[in-house]
């Protein structure tokens, strides 16, 4: 099943919007590329809704939060929900209250991040 999912992903090569932190931006872009998709890293609140609208999915990594990126994350998450795009919060346990108004379709976390 996972093999089929990756084959489907690679055949479509979707553009994936990533709002990540400064520590992992390169790693996140490389992971998206390794899965067969194309990353775009955009976190300015003035553009995130437009960027999310042209992408096939949204990845939000909240490793180092700040007020600017939190605003961008919430705007992008709401837009992804409106469009029915899949999206994912990484390191979600500390921010469950933030996720409540914009529920993600996928949540990821590591034991070391909890």
Task: Describe the residue ranges of each PLM region.
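Active-site-flanking structural segment that lines cofactor/substrate pockets
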Residues: 40-49
């Amino acid at each position: 099943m996972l093999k089929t999912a990756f084959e489907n992903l690679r055949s479509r090569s979707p553009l994936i919007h990533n709002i990540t932190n400064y520590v992992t931006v390169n790693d996140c872009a490389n992971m998206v590329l390794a899965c067969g998709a194309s990353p775009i890293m955009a976190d300015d609140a003035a553009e995130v809704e437009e960027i999310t609208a042209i992408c096939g999915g949204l990845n939000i990594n909240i490793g180092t939060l700040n007020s600017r990126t939190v605003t961008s994350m919430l705007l992008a998450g709401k837009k992804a929900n409106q469009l029915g795009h899949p999206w994912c919060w990484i390191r979600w346990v500390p921010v469950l209250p933030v996720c409540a108004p914009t529920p993600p379709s996928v949540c990821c976390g590591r034991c070391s991040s909890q």
